[in-house]
Amino acid sequence: MGGPELEQLIALLARLPGLGPRSARRAALRLLQQPETRLLPLAAAMQNAARAVKTCRVCGNLDSADPCSVCTDPSRENGLICVVESVGDLWAMDRAGIYRGLYHVLGGVLSALAGTGPDALNWPALMRRIESSRPSATPVTEVILALGATVDGATTAHWLAEQLRPMGVSVTRLAQGIPIGGALDVLDDGTLAAAMRARRSA
């Protein structure tokens, strides 16, 4: 139905996160019903992004500039590096607007199940960044491990903290616990335990 071109469009859309075959079919229909205002501008924007966007050689962010706009922002606190698993995590942290330091994208987490070891992660570049900052006026003094609250995230944070400690920087982790608006009776035991351990003065 619709020919091979339409089926290819639907199949490619269905590969996107959050879109299954039915959602992809609806999206394709919307795009094709208004090609001048939806489909063609989207296609042009995707081509422009494919040509212009690159991976930042410093932190691993995606940007049209290399180094990226975060790494070159003079208002950032150069003494802080927040380590995240993915570019999506970097964008989420930055969108929250509570952190004004630099970032480092690890590119994954250690996972015995998936066979992901230290060699697959971008941690040597983090060590080089810390080392090369030492002669500057603003050396890296703290590394914040902002990895997911999963077994793999916790394992990676523990392993990375062990690698970082000999470098003489403060290594911290994000507190974990009760989300804003979360009711206690619907939280799992692990979340409640983490919240209790991360309690602070009221």
UniProtKB/Swiss-Prot annotation:
Q: Which gene encodes it?
A: recR
Name the coiled-coil region(s).
none
Q: Which domain of life is it from?
A: Bacteria
Q: Where is the Toprim domain?
A: 79-179
Kindly give the InterPro entries that the UniProt entry links to this protein: DNA_Rcmb_RecR, Rcmb_RecR, Rcmb_RecR_Znf, TOPRIM_dom, TOPRIM_RecR
Q: Matching Pfam families, A to Z?
A: RecR_C, RecR_HhH, RecR_ZnF, Toprim_4
Q: Zinc finger, C4-type: residue spans?
A: 56-71
Q: Name one GO molecular function term.
A: zinc ion binding
**Family, per entry:** Belongs to the RecR family.
According to its UniProt entry, the function of this protein is described as: May play a role in DNA repair. It seems to be involved in an RecBC-independent recombinational process of DNA repair. It may act with RecF and RecO.
List the source organism.
Answer: Granulibacter bethesdensis (strain ATCC BAA-1260 / CGDNIH1)
Give the UniProt record's GO annotations in the biological process aspect.
DNA recombination; DNA repair
The record, for NCBIfam families, names:
recR (TIGR00615)
Key words, A-Z: DNA damage, DNA recombination, DNA repair, Metal-binding, Zinc, Zinc-finger
This protein is called what? Recombination protein RecR
The answer, when asked if DNA repair is one of the entry's keywords, is yes
